[in-house]
Amino acid sequence: MFKKSMLLSIQSVLALLVILAASLMPTWAAEQEPSVAWEKIDRGVMLIDVRTAEEFAEGHIDGAMNIPFNNIVPELAKLNITKNTEIVLYCRSGNRSDMAQKSLVKQGYSNTYNAGGFNSLISAR
């Protein structure tokens, strides 16, 4: 009897841990869908190109502002961007926008989307 109730308790705790872990999955795990990104961009959300100034000058999405990924947190703070502002980030491949997004989420920004790479976005348009 004791073994059975102990086993049931362990199973319950494990099930609770799985549910908790699933709810804490990063928001960027299923992102980088160009169609979703374009829907957001077309709605006029804040669009940030996190590539270098040189890459930005070579071409960018209309309406995007350029903030290199390693400056994203202090620059948004300087601009007084609220932490619930809807923000779409992109770079060349999706890696730097992922790093920028993680930095923003860590600082409490709750409405960010990693749109992935510039070329993928342009080809999907």
Task: Tell me the role of every PLM-derived stretch.
Residues 90:
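Short, surface-exposed ligand- or partner-binding patches at beta-edge/loop junctions that are enriched
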Residues 48-49:
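Structural scaffold elements adjacent to functional motifs in cytosolic proteins
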